[in-house]
Amino acid sequence: PRVRSFIAHQSGITSVIRRSPDIAHRMVRSLSVSSQRNKSVAHHEDVYSHNLPPMDEKEMALYKLYRPERVTPKKRSAELLKEPRLNKGMGFSLYERQYLGLHGLLPPAFMTQEQQAYRVITKLREQPNDLARYIQLDGLQDRNEKLFYRVVCDHVKELMPIVYTPTVGLACQNFGYIYRKPKGLYITINDNSVSKIYQILSNWHEEDVRAIVVTDGERILGLGDLGAYGIGIPVGKLALYVALGGVQPKWCLPVLLDVGTNNMDLLNDPFYIGLRHKRVRGKDYDTLLDNFMKACTKKYGQKTLIQFEDFANPNAFRLLDKYQDKYTMFNDDIQGTASVIVAGLLTCTRVTKKLVSQEKYLFFGAGAASTGIAEMIVHQMQNEGISKEEACNRIYLMDIDGLVTKNRKEMNPRHVQFAKDMPETTSILEVIRAARPGALIGASTVRGAFNEEVIRAMAEINERPIIFALSNPTSKAECTAEEAYTFTNGAALYASGSPFPNFELNGHTYKPGQGNNAYIFPGVALGTILFQIRHVDNDLFLLAAKKVASCVTEDSLKVGRVYPQLKEIREISIQIAVEMAKYCYKNGTANLYPQPEDLEKYVRAQVYNTEYEELINATYDWPEQDMRHGFPVPVVRHDSMDG
C-alpha cells in the first residue's frame, strides 16, 4: 500500500504541475520530508532490536508483542529539550527539529549518538579527578538520559567506579557542595503518616514506579553516618539497575528517609542539607518505616520492588526479617553481598577441586554483610548434602571483640549458631592456626588487617588460599591485590570489594576480580520486576550466584579473575532474570500472566535500549474508500447564480 500510495502521489504531482506550480512544489517537498521520515523510522526499527539475534517472522512478531510501545511526546520546543528522557541534543534529525519545534534552538550541527558519546568520554578523561568526573556525568544524566546510559554501558569498567563505589562515597561526603538538581524523594521523620508519605510519593513525576531503593543514610558504604547526604547511594544504585540490568529509568525511584544524623561534623556543617538533630530511634523510627512501606504499596501496588540499602547493622537484619514475607523487598547489603561472594566461592571450587561444604571459612568482621554471607554459605552447604549444624561448624566469625565463642555473655542472636567452643582470642593468626580455614573473608573496614604474616599463614595451610578483602572503599580494604599475590607467590584466589589494578609477578599478569554486588542485584531486580515475583528469598539469590559463577571463563581463571568481566554484566543480568522466571513459574511464585511464550525474548524485549529512538510515530495508510467524503459535492454553475 505504501508503494501504491507513493506512485499515486507521483502521478498527482505530474498532473498538478501544469495547473499550479506552487502546489506541485509543496507536494514535492512533502514527499521529500516523508522519505526522510521513513528512513528514520526504518533506522529506528533496526536499533530497536539491536541486542537480539537474527529472528524469523514468528520470533519477530513475538518480540514486537513484548516490547514497550513508544508514543509521540506531547512536549514541544524548549520544554522538550528540558526533558532528559527525550532530549537528544544535536542528535535530533532535521525532520524532528522542524516537526517538534526545535529548529533554531539547537546549533546547526547534526551528530550521531556515537559522536556524542565520544565527545563525552573525551571530556571526562580530561577532568582532574574522579569527583569532577562524577559531577560531569551527573550533569549529563540531567540533560540527556539515553546518552548518559550509552556512555556508561560502553565504558562500564572505566565508569562504574565513578557512578558507584568508590567515587559515590566521596560524592556523598561532599553532597552539600556538589548538589545541583533533585534526583529522588526526601521523606523525613516529620512526615510520619501514611497519608503524608503518600502525598510526597505523589509529587514524583513518574506514576509507573516499579523499583524503589531506600536508605536512611546511617551506614553509607564504609563511611558511616552521612544522613541526608546518603541520597547519592539510591541514585547510584538505580543508575546501575538501568545500565547493568536494563531496568527502565521511568520505573526507578530513589528515596532518602531523613531521621536526623549522629554525625557531629555534618550537624555543624553550614552546607548540610538534612535535618539538624540527632537520629530518631525506637517506636517513632519503626512507625516511619511501617508507614513508608504501606504508602509505597498503596501508591504503586504490592508488586513494587523495595530495596533496602546501607541501613546500620542493628536495623538491617531486623527490617529484612520484618518485611521480607510481607512485601516485595530485599536488602542488597545482606542478600546481594552474600550472593556475589558465594558466586566467587563457587568459582574457586573449580580451582581448589573442593566443594563449598568441604572448606572452612574465617570471617574477619561480623556485621550484616559477613553474617549474611555466612548464612548463604550454610544454605549452599545444605544443598550439597550436609546438615545445618555441620555447615555452621565450618564457619568462624571474628568481630571487634575477637572470635565469637560460646563463652560470651552477650551475643548477636544470629551469631549463636556460629559460636565456637574455643578459647577467646583477638588474634587472626591464632584462629587461622587453630581452625585451618581454606578461605579468609574480610568485611571489617580495617585497612591492613590481613598483613604479611596473616597472608603467609593462609598460604602455609592451603595450596590455593582464598582471600577476599571486601571492605569499601579501597582505603579500607583488609589487604591489596598486590599484597595477596606477593605474599602467596601468586597462589591466592583473591577478590576485593572495590577495584584494584592489574598486578604483574614473576612474569605473570594477575587481574583481580571485584566481588561487586552489581553482578547480582541488577539481574535480581530485573527478574523480580518483569515477572512480578512477590517474595525475593535466598533461593533466588543462590540461583543468581550459580549463574554468575557459570559465566567465568577458563581464560579468566588463568589470570586470577574469579568473577566475569564487567562488560558482561548486562548479559548476565538478562540470564539471571530468565533463570528466575523459570524457577518462579515452576514454583508458582511468578505473578505475570499469561506466562510469556518465550521467557528470554520477553526479557530482551523489555530491557532499556540506550540507542536513540524516533520520537515521532510512523505514519500509515488507510484504505482509500475510507478516506472519501460521504456524499458528492453538487456542481453549481456560475451562470445560475446570476440575478
UniProtKB/Swiss-Prot annotation:
Cofactors demanded by this protein: Mg(2+); Mn(2+)
Activity regulation note: Subject to allosteric activation by fumarate.
Co-factor binding details: Divalent metal cations. Prefers magnesium or manganese.
First-listed, main subcellular location of the protein, grouped into a coarse class: mitochondrion
EC number: 1.1.1.38
GO molecular function terms attached to this record: malate dehydrogenase (decarboxylating) (NAD+) activity; malate dehydrogenase (decarboxylating) (NADP+) activity; metal ion binding; NAD binding; oxaloacetate decarboxylase activity
Transit peptide, from-to: 1-38
Binding site for a divalent metal cation: E309, D310, D333
Variant or mutagenesis effect after changing D333A: Reduces activity over 100000-fold
Effect after changing E96A: Reduces activity over 1000-fold
Cellular component terms per the entry's GO annotation: mitochondrial matrix
Additional information: This isoenzyme can also use NADP(+) but is more effective with NAD(+).
Subunit field text: Homotetramer.
Name assigned to this protein: NAD-dependent malic enzyme, mitochondrial
Organism: Ascaris suum (Pig roundworm)
Lineage: Eukaryota, Metazoa, Ecdysozoa, Nematoda, Chromadorea
